[in-house]
Amino acid sequence: MAEGGSLRNRTRFGSRSNEAMNHVDYPDENFVEEIQLNSDTEVMEKPRPIQIVLAHEDDHNFELDETALESILMQDHIRDLNVVVLSVAGAFRKGKSFLLDFMLRFMYSQSSSWIGGNYEPLTGFTWRGGCERETTGIQIWSEVFVVEKPDGSKVAVILMDTQGAFDSQSTIKDCATVFALSTMTSSVQVYNLSQNIQEDDLQHLQLFTEYGRLAMEEIYKKPFQTLMFLIRDWSYPYEHSYGLEGGNKFLEKRLQVKQNQHEELQNVRKHIHSCFTNIGCFLLPHPGLKVATNPYFDGRLVEIDDEFKKELRELVPLLLAPENLVEKEISGSKVTCRDLLEYFKAYIKIYQGEELPHPKSMLQATAEANNMAAVAGAKDTYSRSMEQVCGGDKPYIAPSDLERKHLDLKETCIKQFRSVKKMGGEEFCRRYQEQLEAEIEETYANFLKHNDGKNIFYAARTPATLFAVMFAMYIISGLTGFIGMNSIATICNLIMGLTLLSFCTWAYVKYSGEFRELGTLIDQIAEIIWEQLLKPLSDNLMEDNIRQTVRNSIKAGLTDQVSGRLKTN
């Protein structure tokens, strides 16, 4: 590719009739589209991987580099083209970037020898040998390839590289977010696995795709498009041959739902089938010991086993040949580069917020379920025991006795919770014990209200309060009317009428069960009047009466003593 005012070559792949599903014929140079760029307005940079989703390790959050993404997707010649996004995801240090660089060779090539020369170093997405992660966040290649499909339509092809999952610095949420984002925005997701498809690989796929499906506002049939299982270092060609045919037979067995399978295993497989429109599998051999053990390996084909190169020549065209390209769709509609930019912005906001639940490790999820079950068991014990004390068919019990029973049962239930074997450790379990105590107190408050409702005096508080208000207003109205204070008498009559209307309404609500909110409001107003006015007044009157009674008793006692002494003298 030339820079500045030179011509940019973009590869066009023609299609001819092929005898096998994987066979691809390569075009001659007449199919290469040349795009003239104005050197005065655009300075071409060397194509390179561009970081579009940044990973912040300190707070385990992700940020979209909108400027970088916009500079790629909003170029004049591609922004209104339908987009094809091929993403490679999977565990870290399994060769995702290495594979993508061969895809770049295919996209830039103009001949059937796209795989390159034997002594040509592999360049493109950064990769290296070793055990430490290389890629973080999400990267895309800065060069968007415009390809003409067999039907004559042009599409924009984007290659995406993702942060490897399950490294020592990433949480389950980090892994789920990266995988979900790449799956939601890609039309083909290559799930890069090593040696085999393990059950935990399927479980992680279920978790990650469900995390992506939660973030999508509308689900149109199956939310995602094509999933390609790529099994690297396949060691059993005598059972299933390398390539697509052997891979699909192997995958069919792995994803088969059997009657004798455990329900959990069946659900995993059903979920995966429900998420993707197309699912395939490709078996790729090991690239050779020189690749695995040479610290200076730079991708030269001479050091790669011939069997690997043979299958690689089948795999890459299978994904990227013009007749095999899968255009990105969301909710049944084709997505352009311009649309993809907006979807990226919308999706990253969802994952930056707190609307979605946080994915958890298997240990944490199991520990939570274990502790929640212990909480539920202890709370059930408390509720059943309290039902025996003050349930619906039990008579009213004194509040002091009820509180004493509550405290005894609470202590018993906490002991029951502690006695259950739980995962997570003491600190983890303490949070659930505090949750249990709070829920028991909340349940006790409900039982207390239910018990108060059985108290005939408590049940009669509202009508008694309303009658007291009406009686008081009647007396005050009569007195103020008698002495000529007619305005006050009128106000008292108005209050008395409103109180009478409230009483009739309350009686209707209790009888019919309708307008319960209105009945509750009347009860609350009556309770306020009782607590703030009538109860303090009655307490004062009672205190005065008791004080006067005590005074009279003392006076009578003293009088009797004095009289007795006088008689004695």
From Swiss-Prot:
One of the Pfam families matching this protein, by short name: GBP
Transcription regulation recorded as keyword: no
Cell compartments where the protein resides: Endoplasmic reticulum membrane
Ranges per topology, Cytoplasmic: 1-464, 509-569
Taxonomy, superkingdom: Eukaryota
Region 3HB (three-helix bundle) domain, residue ranges: 362-453
Name the record gives this protein: Atlastin-2
UniProt source species: Xenopus laevis
